[in-house]
């Protein structure tokens, strides 16, 4: 585009071309409709005020198009220029302070073009402000360029009247080729992106999502950018086509373009030094600081991007933090952590509560003829230091990858497992139920830390943070079946007569311990995959199922005053065992399918209606979860659960709960029994002063209190009359 030469009288006018102005309207009709406040009594400047303004070094070719509202002190405007229709609300001699930054109200050394300015604002050294509606008590200081175009989308993936499809901004999560593209919109959450990106085979569903997104935003040209009340923007270079919510704080940003910054006085969003953000939607209460580069992205509420993060073509769920690293083409559910500057995450679906360690390279994009690989990981995925994974891989929930190079694709169906590449023996090794067996403290800490980190005031969706929940329980059921098959196969391959896994464990436990259990279909290679401690893992999985199901049922009975007879009318075989992690919210698979069908048939007309349905699904979650626990326990018992049988399982669960609490304490104590942990301290007293003792550990104390309550609950329901 070439530099254009304009006539002076047209400067500041004709924001919307005549072809896009409806009959009977003018170029300001949308601008006037954007103000949420009661109409002000705008008036023209008096001759005395114009004289004062000129004396103060101000310039305007059309002073009659500068309107003000009383009280108005013209002496507070100095060395500034105005063009087009400029409206300035009441302006009095005041000071505005934000933290330690204090400035006087007024407009100095600035240029305003067709803008509305709210009450008692401070605008200083802003070289170019064009087509913005500025709220009350806003501070704008030392901004090079702040402008809005007539076709601004403010981060939404829509096209305006008269535009071609080619200009639409899309995001390509999970796959770099664009085959899973979605249209971002204000209010989008990880669940929306999941529905859209992960069901591409449903053509009608895709069409509904596209039309809903396009219809959610007004396609008319001429909307102004907004900087809402109590916002502070200072020392920035270029800001173009950005809407800022109330209480936004921006300092030292290099470039902000085509964004919506959602913010409120209760959940202010902050953007800091050296940041460059283009084509995105930022949630409430976010912090984006120190050299972050993000392009084509959606941030959930209470997210943080820091220290040079590169986030491109990605959707990040609520309560997540990414620092220093590179994340491309990723769909990440809530509570993700990635802190180190030498990790990257490429083309992946991470289902939240996850952690990518230093040196982790998740996704080698060049192991196929095209950059079309994908990685899918369940909740709680944790890649160890310097681990390397290649596309395509799939992981169950709470899988810990040790720091190794994994040369082939992986499909790990065992939740709570430890995976390692044994290079000496040239084999992959998996320890199912590792966390339950050897790191119970980490399981408990996970749940507690996520609850503590949830600072959201705006909660669009109910997110499950409990480690043991319907999704992980379903994975345990599937893993248990695979483990049983592997044990039975190993038993026969060792020259024994065929037996069920249960009989092998009960009748030949010692002999079974000596037989290696191998798996197939886990790694895309010719080498073997060995299961570590398969019998212990089998028992652990069964204990988890019993403990979880009894705990869930009895908690439900306590909350609702219902009993086991409430479920006996249900055929457990008709209750779905499979649940879907829908952006952090857990939904039974059959209800999830109904949701998709209702969207396809047009029952839900907008994303707002879909979000309401998320709430409706959340409202039945506790009942659905209890029903699921009943079905799982019936499957485990191979019969319907009645009051006496439930009593038996409750007695077993008491033993498991005591083991669980003991293991939490025991796994924490390991840190104190390790002699190498002592070498940086002069004596145990210094160590305890720094770290505290296991007995003082708040997590352990809280867990013991919760366990006492649970055991008391179990005790109350031991007698069959209470269960029936």
Curated annotation (Swiss-Prot):
Q: What is this protein called?
A: Uncharacterized protein TP_0851
Pfam families assigned to the protein according to its UniProt record, in alphabetical order: DUF4954, DUF6819
Q: Which InterPro entries match?
A: DUF4954 (IPR032533), DUF6819 (IPR049208), Trimer_LpxA-like_sf (IPR011004)
Q: Which domain of life is it from?
A: Bacteria
């Amino acid at each position: 585009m070439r530099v254009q030469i304009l006539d002076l009288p047209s400067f500041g006018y004709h924001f919307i071309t005549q072809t896009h102005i409806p009959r009977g309207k003018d170029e300001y009709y949308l601008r006037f409709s954007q103000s949420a406040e009661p109409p002000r009594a705008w008036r023209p400047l008096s001759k005395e005020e114009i004289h004062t303004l000129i004396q103060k070094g101000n310039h305007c070719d059309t002073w009659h198009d500068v309107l003000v509202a009383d009280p108005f002190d013209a002496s507070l405007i100095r060395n500034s220029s105005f063009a087009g229709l400029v409206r300035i609300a009441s302006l009095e001699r005041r000071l505005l302070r934000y933290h330690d930054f204090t400035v006087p109200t007024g407009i100095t050394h600035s240029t305003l073009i067709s803008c509305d300015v709210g009450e008692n604002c401070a605008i200083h050294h802003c070289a170019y402000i064009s087509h913005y509606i500025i709220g009350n008590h806003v501070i704008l200081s030392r901004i090079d360029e702040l402008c809005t175009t007539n076709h601004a989308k403010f981060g939404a993936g829509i096209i305006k009247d008269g535009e071609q499809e080619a200009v639409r901004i899309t995001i390509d999560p999970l796959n770099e080729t664009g085959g899973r593209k979605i249209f971002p919109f204000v209010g989008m959450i990880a669940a929306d992106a999941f529905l859209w990106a992960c069901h591409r085979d449903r053509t009608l569903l895709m069409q509904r999502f596209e039309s809903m997104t396009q219809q959610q935003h007004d396609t008319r040209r001429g909307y102004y950018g907004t900087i809402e009340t109590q916002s502070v923007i200072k020392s920035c270079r270029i800001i173009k086509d950005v809407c800022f919510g109330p209480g936004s704080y921006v300092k030292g940003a290099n470039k902000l373009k085509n964004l919506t910054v959602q913010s409120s006085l209760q959940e202010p969003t902050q953007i800091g030094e050296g940041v460059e953000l283009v084509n995105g939607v930022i949630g409430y209460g976010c912090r984006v600081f120190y050299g972050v580069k993000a392009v084509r992205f959606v941030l959930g509420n209470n997210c943080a991007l820091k220290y040079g993060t590169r986030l491109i073509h990605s959707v990040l769920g609520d309560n997540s933090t990414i620092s220093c690293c590179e994340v491309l083409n990723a769909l990440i559910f809530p509570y993700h952590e990635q802190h180190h500057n030498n990790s990257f995450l490429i083309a992946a679906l991470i289902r939240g509560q996850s952690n990518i360690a230093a040196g982790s390279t998740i996704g080698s994009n060049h192991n196929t003829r095209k950059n079309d690989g994908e990685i899918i990981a369940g909740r709680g995925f944790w890649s160890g230091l310097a681990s390397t994974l290649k596309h395509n891989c799939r992981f169950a929930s709470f899988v810990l990858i040790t720091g190794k190079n994994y040369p082939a694709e992986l499909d790990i169906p065992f939740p709570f497992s430890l995976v390692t590449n044994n290079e000496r023996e040239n084999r992959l090794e998996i320890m199912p139920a590792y966390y339950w067996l050897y790191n119970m403290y980490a399981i408990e800490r996970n749940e507690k830390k996520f609850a503590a980190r949830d600072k959201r005031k705006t909660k669009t969706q109910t997110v499950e943070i409990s480690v043991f929940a319907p999704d992980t329980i379903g994975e345990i059921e599937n893993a248990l079946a695979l483990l049983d098959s592997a044990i039975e196969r190993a038993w026969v391959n060792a020259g024994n007569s065929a037996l069920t896994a249960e009989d092998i464990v009960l009748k030949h436990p010692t002999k079974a311990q000596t037989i290696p259990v191998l798996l197939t279909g886990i790694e895309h290679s010719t080498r073997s995959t060995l299961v570590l401690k398969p019998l212990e893992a089998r028992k652990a999985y069964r204990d988890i199922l019993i403990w979880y199901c009894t705990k869930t049922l009895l908690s439900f009975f306590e909350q609702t005053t219902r009993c086991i007879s409430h479920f006996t009318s249900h055929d457990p075989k008709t209750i779905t065992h499979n649940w879907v992690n829908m952006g952090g919210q857990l939904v039974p698979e059959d209800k999830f399918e109904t949701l998709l069908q209702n969207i396809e048939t047009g029952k839900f007309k907008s994303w707002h209606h879909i979000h309401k349905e998320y709430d409706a699904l959340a409202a039945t979650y506790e009942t659905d979860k209890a029903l699921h626990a009943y079905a799982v326990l019936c499957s485990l018992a191979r019969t319907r659960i009645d009051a006496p049988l439930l009593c038996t399982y409750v007695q077993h669960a008491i033993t498991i709960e005591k083991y669980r609490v003991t293991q939490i304490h025991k796994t924490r104590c390991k840190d104190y029994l390790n002699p190498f942990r002592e070498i940086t301290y002069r004596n145990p007293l210094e160590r305890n002063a720094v770290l505290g003792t296991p007995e003082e550990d708040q997590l352990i104390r809280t867990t013991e209190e919760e366990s006492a309550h649970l055991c008391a609950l179990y005790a109350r329901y031991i007698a069959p009359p209470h269960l029936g």
